[in-house]
């Protein structure tokens, strides 16, 4: 099951007893998933959601908390839409429910944000607002660099109300307008985890955290692999450059090279891409890395001094830009 669907499925099965909390959730669901329509002179409330379990939860809450009946209409997917959608419709007593849930104010005017009783409610009410908004129009992407939890909002007022509810929970969320659509977005992984916990999606959080950890381990492994590859490449480049310098050193010094330095230099030339450790093991008798490095260093210093005395190019002259290319 996709992450968004698993979160919604879990939230739709969450058992809430407190009346004020259930009211806050219903108000948010109707605000973020619904709308008011005038049909034959009567106010009808419709809320469209993407899971049958969410529709059943809303229908049950409307009946148990407010005492109004509703119906669920299944809208089959077609065109760009995949999967069925579920519309919870309240025809009879639609106006009464709209007033009770804060979709209409005392004068019968539409409320654009959330009702003040919900906005100024408890922390549990703020959690319920987020739960209802997420069930209505929320999404959660896979953890990673572009992970996000977001809710599509019916307008800027409801987006700001949702940001305010997050703030009451100590959570930072941002309201944004993207291509004319208002959204509230959370991108920080730890903050997403906190909100999932506060909403009550504990099982989904475990799945999300496991995937998050797996992504982080994989990213770390890739970084280390790239680091190792880069180090190996640089080591090989340094070895090739050293081989070219030794070639020039032997040319400059000719027969005036002490045998032990000449032997080390010839090893370097013969095995241009070998590491100093490998050169030491190839020597007969074997030498330590420091011993072979010391001999090559003295050979190069001797050759560069001779080149300076003679006024000719030193050992660096043999190192070309191509040898140092990444």
Curated annotation (Swiss-Prot):
Q: What does this protein do?
A: Involved in cell division and chromosome segregation.
InterPro entries linked to this entry: Homing_endonucl, Sporu_reg_WhiA_N_dom, Sporulation_regulator_WhiA, Sporulation_regulator_WhiA_C, WhiA_LAGLIDADG_dom
Cite the entry's keywords alphabetically.
Answer: Cell cycle, Cell division, DNA-binding
Q: What is this protein called?
A: Probable cell division protein WhiA
Task: Give GO MF terms, alphabetically.
Answer: DNA binding
- In which domain of life is the source organism classified? Bacteria
Name the family the entry cites: Belongs to the WhiA family.
Look up keyword Cell cycle and say if it applies.
Answer: yes
Record has Hydrolase as a keyword: no
One example of a Gene Ontology biological process annotation: regulation of sporulation
Q: State the signal peptide span.
A: none
Q: Which residues bind DNA?
A: 275-308
Organism of origin: Paenarthrobacter aurescens (strain TC1)
NCBIfam families registered for this protein in UniProt: DNA_bind_WhiA (TIGR00647)
């Amino acid at each position: 099951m996709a992450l968004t669907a698993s979160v919604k499925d879990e939230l739709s099965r969450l058992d809430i007893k407190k009346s004020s909390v259930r009211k806050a959730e219903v108000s948010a669901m109707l605000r973020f998933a619904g709308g008011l329509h005038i049909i034959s002179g009567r106010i009808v409330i419709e809320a469209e959601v993407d899971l049958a379990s969410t529709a059943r939860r809303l229908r049950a809450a409307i009946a148990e908390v407010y005492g109004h009946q509703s119906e669920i209409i299944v809208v089959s997917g077609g065109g760009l839409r995949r999967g069925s959608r579920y519309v919870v419709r309240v025809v009879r007593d639609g106006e009464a429910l709209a007033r009770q849930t804060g979709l209409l104010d005392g004068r019968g005017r539409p409320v654009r944000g959330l009702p003040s009783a919900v906005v100024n409610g408890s922390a549990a009410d703020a959690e319920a607002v987020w739960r209802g908004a997420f069930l209505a129009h929320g999404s959660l992407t896979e953890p990673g660099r572009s992970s996000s939890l977001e809710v599509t909002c019916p307008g800027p007022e409801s987006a700001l109300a949702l940001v305010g509810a997050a703030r009451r929970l100590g959570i930072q969320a941002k309201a944004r307008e993207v291509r004319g659509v208002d959204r509230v977005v959370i991108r920080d992984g730890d903050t997403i985890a906190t909100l999932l916990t506060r909403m009550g999606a504990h099982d989904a959080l475990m799945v999300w955290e496991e995937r998050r950890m797996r992504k982080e381990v994989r990213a770390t492994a890739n970084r280390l692999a790239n680091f190792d590859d880069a180090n190996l490449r640089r080591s090989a480049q340094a070895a090739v450059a050293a081989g070219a310098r030794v070639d020039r050193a032997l040319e400059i010094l000719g027969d005036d090279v002490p045998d032990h330095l000449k032997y080390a230099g010839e090893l370097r030339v013969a095995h241009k891409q070998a590491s100093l450790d490998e050169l030491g093991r190839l020597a007969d008798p074997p030498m330590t890395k420091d011993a072979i490095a010391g001999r090559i260093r003295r050979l190069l210093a001797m050759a560069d001094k001779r080149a300076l005395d003679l006024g000719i190019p030193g050992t660096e002259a043999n190192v070309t830009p191509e040898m140092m290319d990444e």
